[in-house]
């Protein structure tokens, strides 16, 4: 297990009430496991579960992606993007 920083933006921040927190993840993991762990730890995110995106070290993550997490890894929880 490795402790990594999880960052919350926009509606994710509003739902969780924190900008960032350190969370334990397996050092070798995949996109699906990252989502599962984050949603278990922060059930309020279920409101945006179907539309939220994850980024690992400032790169968008996709289903099927695998990761080797390290102590300085950052995971961002990004709500649906909107604009005009």
From Swiss-Prot:
Keyword line: Cytoplasm, Molybdenum cofactor biosynthesis, Nucleotide-binding, Phosphoprotein
Keyword flag Cytoplasm: yes
Subcellular location: Cytoplasm
Pathway listed: Cofactor biosynthesis; molybdopterin biosynthesis
Signal peptide boundaries: none
Molecular-function annotations in GO: molybdopterin synthase activity; nucleotide binding
Record-linked InterPro entries: Beta-grasp_dom_sf, MOCS2A, MOCS2A_euk, Mopterin_synth/thiamin_S_b, ThiS/MoaD-like
Assembly with partners or alone: Heterotetramer; composed of 2 small (MOCS2A) and 2 large (MOCS2B) subunits.
Name under which the protein is recorded: Molybdopterin synthase sulfur carrier subunit
